[in-house]
């Protein structure tokens, strides 16, 4: 059985991964259907690890903010579970979709109930759920405050240019939301729900901030650096389970096979991954693979899991 790596070894592992991937920087295809994301330099690469013992390790562009996009769905799901508990599962499923993240076909076939909270239709439903009793502006503010609380960092903001860019070009998301509204699956006006959705997807964070924000999922629901209790141990375990099975769109099975860690990707090129009991990891490389997941980010996490023995399926 491979020996578990001590924290002091993690920086060496990160440095090695960065050095080995440097010749491949720029590989993959930057998301071009959101104009602001299409302008991002594909040569960027950053990675950060925050251990449950408080060690912070980073490499490359780990302090450069980027658009976290669908990674934000982990945070809105956590908020929804806090507000509504297990009742949310009447509105959204817990199964992998096997289809593209913005597919309408499956939604029609299944009566407007999204397969899981991490595909676009599912996250739009979650936005509708947590909008109850709020104006869109109030809820957007609450989401930002919640993510700042998780990361213990008041500098996290929404990139309003990205939010505006998505609002102008997000025709497929308008179609998904309108479709669910036609099935009686949304309680609020489509424009209000999507206003929330586009803005939380436009959160800008660094790898270091993102790794800190996900640390509660690695430590049984409580951030060990701040003492902030976020969710119960059982709920943290269940969020991790959903990230493992559904966190990478229709590439989730391959990510579980290669990396073996709960994780959530975004088309901005970021991935937040969790090694339960050990660490939270964030990686950013804008070039995407055919499933819309970071090509080099996925490879970096595969290398990290292999060298640390952190896969949840065993070293």
UniProtKB/Swiss-Prot annotation:
One of its GO terms (biological process) is glutamate biosynthetic process. It catalyses: L-glutamine + H2O = L-glutamate + NH4(+). Keywords: Hydrolase. Its EC number is 3.5.1.2. GO terms for molecular function: glutaminase activity. The keyword Transmembrane does not apply. InterPro entries: Beta-lactam/transpept-like, Glutaminase. It comes from the Bacteria. Substrate binds at residues 70, 120, 166, 173, 197, 249, 267. Belongs to the glutaminase family. Homotetramer. This is Glutaminase. It comes from Sinorhizobium fredii (strain NBRC 101917 / NGR234). The lineage of its organism: Bacteria, Pseudomonadati, Pseudomonadota, Alphaproteobacteria, Hyphomicrobiales. The gene is glsA.
